[in-house]
Swiss-Prot record:
It holds the Pfam family Cpn60_TCP1. Together with its co-chaperonin GroES, plays an essential role in assisting protein folding. The GroEL-GroES system forms a nano-cage that allows encapsulation of the non-native substrate proteins and provides a physical environment optimized to promote and accelerate protein folding. This is Chaperonin GroEL 1. The lineage of its organism: Bacteria, Bacillati, Actinomycetota, Actinomycetes, Kitasatosporales. The gene is groEL1. GO terms for cellular component: cytoplasm. It comes from the Bacteria.
């Protein structure tokens, strides 16, 4: 396939046009008075959203050179979303401003490499300043404010704060669609996994079709159990120790005579046991069984560690205050494991999360962490139409990510003002000279853009507002929702510092790449077949 090339200034200008097309689409959504964007879908109803990354993902530009620029900014939005879960529009606006200011200087003869050096130094300084001014949050009211601001709905804020309160900061909060109106909070304490009983005969509560075991022993077995001879010695020990104590069996599978014997004993009322399959597959199953063992104070019975089912005693069994098993789920509440061991296991999983590159692995590790650390909260969301439901669900997910980011690194004043104050550390250009100093100045000028566009979307004169905010003290700023200046943190206009930092760092990283670009290579578009046949006066009857 033939390629076409573009060089120097032409190349950079084409990239800039692409950046502008994408950024101009996204920046109308920034701030409390931001507008919506409607995205056409080939199938189903159109999507209405004001979420930067959702819009960015949909934009493809016709001109192949410009498209490269648009895709680069898309990367900024996606990366910021992955790290902090919010701030995608801010990142896009910053990237556009950095590219615009930077290219002006490159066109005027500045060295791209030195500019990049200056930009990097400035971003590092601003990032450190933001962290230094951040305020840690642990109050429920602060959490509600962050979440409410991200979702643009104070009721959602309260709900997320409630959920965070219940599951702790490592807990899992998921969003599900419900077929009723409004929002509901569903909390599962303890460890839940998605495997239910192997036979409906195990049910103890006929009405709710669930088996509830109070204060049971818990047997955790890595392989299959099919022969009753393997299980009998242990069952006899359990009955001798305490005949009324139920037993939960978690194994790869329980089948054949082992299962039928357990069922018969349950029906006769001689012995109460429930068998469930182990959650997960392969290595993840091993890890999850290990988690359950740590939580309940038991041991995983596996031949590889020298434990055989027909030779073990009661010391390998775990315990819990209560276990509830339904057709699809098992929940273990208040496992009998030692809190030190559980804490050790939690730290081990946290270390794995730090070291993994795969998003999928990270997500699964976080699920395991949450199950050990506290519990799972499900927020059920309902709406009148499919379109509204999608939009609400999306807003909730964003708000949860923003809240996590806030709990992690703290908060700064929102509404774009934190950046305006933080770039004051760049006055004097960090002692740099020449083109490096110009790079620092580029960041200083670009950092006011998010605030400018928040003001513009509210129908005001952007640069007038930014220069006014720059004169105020730290923490003071402009509240676009009310049109007033004042202490933003007090009035609940706050941003997680992680969001603001990630937005600036990702925007700068793409902008400096773009400034140091000299050549673009794209595929030559295929000639349209149709044109060949549509007679240019040849062979048609005239």
């Amino acid at each position: 396939m033939a390629k076409i090339l573009k060089f120097d200034e032409d190349a950079r200008r084409a990239l800039e046009r692409g950046v502008n097309k994408l950024a101009d689409t996204v920046k109308v959504t920034i701030g409390p008075k931001g507008r919506n964007v409607v995205i056409d879908k080939k199938f189903g109803a159109p999507t209405i959203t004001n979420d930067g990354v959702t819009i960015a993902r949909e934009v493809e530009v016709e001109d192949p050179y410009e498209n490269l620029g648009a895709q680069l900014v898309k990367e900024v939005a996606t990366k910021t979303n992955d790290i902090a879960g919010d701030g995608t529009t801010t990142a896009t606006v910053l990237a556009q401003a950095l590219v615009r200011e930077g290219l002006k200087n490159v066109a005027a003869g500045a060295s791209p490499a030195l500019l990049k050096k200056g930009i990097d130094a400035a971003v590092k300084a601003v990032s450190e300043e933001l962290l230094a001014t951040a305020r840690p949050i642990d109050e429920k009211s602060d959490i509600a404010a962050v979440a409410g601001l991200s979702a643009q709905d104070s009721q959602v804020g309260e709900l997320i704060a409630e959920a965070m309160d219940k599951v702790g900061k490592d807990g899992v909060i998921t969003v599900e669609e419900s077929n009723t109106f409004g929002l509901e909070l569903d909390f599962t304490e303890g460890m839940a996994f998605d495997k239910g009983y192997l036979s409906p005969y195990f049910v103890t509560d006929q009405e709710r079709m669930e088996a509830v075991l109070e204060d049971p022993y818990i047997l955790i077995h890595q392989g299959k159990i099919s022969s009753i001879q393997d299980l009998l010695p242990l069952l006899e020990k359990v009955i001798q120790a305490n005949a009324s104590k139920p037993l939960l069996i978690i194994a790869e599978d329980v089948e054949g005579e082992a299962l039928s014997t357990l069922v018969v004993n349950k029906i006769r009322g001689t012995f109460n046991a429930v068998a469930v399959k182990a959650p997960g597959f392969g290595d993840r199953r091993k890890a999850m069984l290990g988690d359950i063992a740590t939580l309940t104070g038991g041991q995983v019975i596996a031949e590889e560690v020298g434990l055989k089912l027909d030779q073990v005693g009661l010391d390998v069994l775990g315990t819990a205050r209560r276990v509830t098993v339904t057709k699809d789920d098992t929940t273990i509440v208040d496992g009998g494991g030692s809190s030190d061991e559980v804490a050790g296991r939690i730290n081990q999983i946290k270390a794995e999360i730090e070291n993994t590159d795969s998003d999928w692995d990270r997500e699964k590790l976080q699920e395991r962490l949450a199950k050990l650390a506290g519990g799972v909260c499900v927020i059920k969301v309902g709406a009148a139409t499919e379109v509204e439901l999608k939009e609400k669900k999306h807003r909730l997910e964003d708000a949860i990510s923003a809240t996590r980011a806030a709990v992690e690194e703290g908060i700064v004043s929102g509404g774009g003002s934190a950046l305006v104050h933080a770039v004051k550390v760049l006055e004097g250009n960090l002692g740099k000279t020449g083109d490096e100093a110009t790079g620092v100045a580029v960041v200083r000028r670009a950092a006011v853009e998010p605030l400018r566009w928040i003001a513009e979307n509210a129908g005001l004169e952007g640069y007038v507002i930014t220069s006014k905010v720059a004169e105020l003290d730290k923490g003071q700023g402009f509240n676009a929702a009310t049109g007033e200046y004042g202490d933003l943190v007090k009035s609940g206009v706050i941003d997680p510092v992680k969001v603001t930092r990630s937005a600036l760092e990702n925007a700068a990283s793409i902008a400096s790449l773009l400034l140091t670009t000299e050549t673009l290579v794209v595929e030559k578009p295929a000639e349209e077949e149709a044109d060949a046949g549509h007679g240019h006066g040849h062979g048609h009857s005239h």
